[in-house]
UniProtKB/Swiss-Prot annotation:
InterPro entries for the chain: Asp/Orn_carbamoyltranf_P-bd, Asp/Orn_carbamoylTrfase, Asp/Orn_carbamoylTrfase_sf, Asp_carbamoyltransf, Asp_carbamoyltransf_Asp/Orn-bd
Primary role: Catalyzes the condensation of carbamoyl phosphate and aspartate to form carbamoyl aspartate and inorganic phosphate, the committed step in the de novo pyrimidine nucleotide biosynthesis pathway.
Record-given protein name: Aspartate carbamoyltransferase catalytic subunit
EC number from the UniProt entry: 2.1.3.2
Pfam families documented for this protein: OTCace, OTCace_N
Provenance organism: Aliivibrio salmonicida (strain LFI1238) (Vibrio salmonicida (strain LFI1238))
Keyword terms, alphabetized: Pyrimidine biosynthesis, Transferase
KW Nucleotide-binding (keyword) present: no
Length: 309
């Protein structure tokens, strides 16, 4: 298969084909089995995080260094010319991208990554999260983790639990899995945090089955993947938050009727939505999922910056 990802901007999941997603997943698995320390030799990657990040930033920078590349950039916009001197984002991108072979960016503004791609003068832009919009590289590591644990991306039953309204990770992953066959979704959330209508409408147009549920209990026996998310406290008053939060806490006891192959995933950080007793069950896979971020991002960088591997 030709590498259609070479020199491509990675802005959103809908712009990636099933074949491209499969190529990234396959490459991540190959790199995990057999490290490739020279794929980014003599390459410079700009890592520009305009808002706080721990896992994504460190995962990207680890991926770059393990492939033999060099990193330039910053982890806070506070000390940049944008903040100190009023430079526009477009000007900043144009200058920094000229120093690098690829430009990795996280920004609080929706659409910032798309804007960056228009001013990077051909340097590939990789979206590391733009507001509540898209987080494509989280989706890539999620897909790789699902494939690693289930051996397939077709014919899966997957539930998303918690904040499905604002959680960009669940939007992107739903759109990605919708490219595969026989996937059934369970969306488990309070009405105020339900999956956005546009996602459900996309699934309706594709004829993909999904259910809207209020509790995990009835779905767990059917699932291959249980994807937990954090309910964000700042969006509720204290009493409402306490009520909603308590309805979506997963314990080891809840997993007793689960299939043997069920894996529990979470984009992290978790707060109270997964009890620590789940950590010791064979279903817990969220820490391995976070580790897989390095391999998925290595695969993406390698494919974007090498015409062939």
């Amino acid at each position: 298969m030709a590498n259609s990802l070479y020199q491509k901007h990675i802005i959103s999941i809908p712009e990636l084909s099933r074949e491209e997603l499969e190529l990234i997943v396959e490459t991540a698995g190959n790199i995990k089995k057999e490290p490739q320390p020279d794929l980014l030799k003599n390459k410079v990657i700009a890592s520009c995080f305009f808002e706080a990040s721990t896992r994504t930033r460190l995962s990207f920078e680890t991926a770059i260094q393990r492939l033999g590349g060099s990193v330039i950039g910053f982890d806070s916009a506070g000390n940049t010319s944008l903040a100190q001197k009023g430079e526009t984002l477009a000007d900043s991108v144009q200058i920094i991208a000229s120093y690098a072979n690829a430009y990795v960016m996280r920004h609080p503004r929706e659409g910032a990554a798309r804007l960056a791609s228009e001013f990077s003068n051909g340097t590939p832009v990789i979206n590391a999260g733009d507001g509540a919009n898209q987080h494509p590289t989280q989706t890539l590591l999620d897909l790789y983790t699902i494939y690693e644990t289930q051996g397939r991306l077709d014919n899966l039953n997957i539930a998303f639990v918690g904040d499905l309204k604002y959680g960009r990770t669940v939007h992107s992953l739903t759109q990605a899995l919708a490219k595969f066959n026989g996937v059934k979704f369970f969306f488990i959330a309070p009405e105020v945090l339900a999956m956005p209508d546009y996602i459900c409408e996309e699934l309706d147009e594709l004829g993909i089955e999904y259910q809207l549920l209020n509790s995990m209990e009835e779905a767990i026996p059917e699932l291959d993947i249980l994807y937990m998310t954090r309910v964000q406290k700042e969006r509720f008053d204290e009493s409402e938050y306490a009520h909603i939060k308590s309805a979506y806490i997963l314990s080891a006891a809840d997993l007793k009727p689960a299939r043997e192959n069920l894996k529990v995933l979470h984009p992290l950080p978790r707060i109270d939505e997964i009890n620590i007793d789940v950590d010791k069950t064979p279903h817990a896979y969220y820490f391995q999922q976070a580790e897989n971020g390095v391999y998925a991002r290595q695969a993406l960088l390698a494919l974007v910056l090498n015409e062939s591997l």
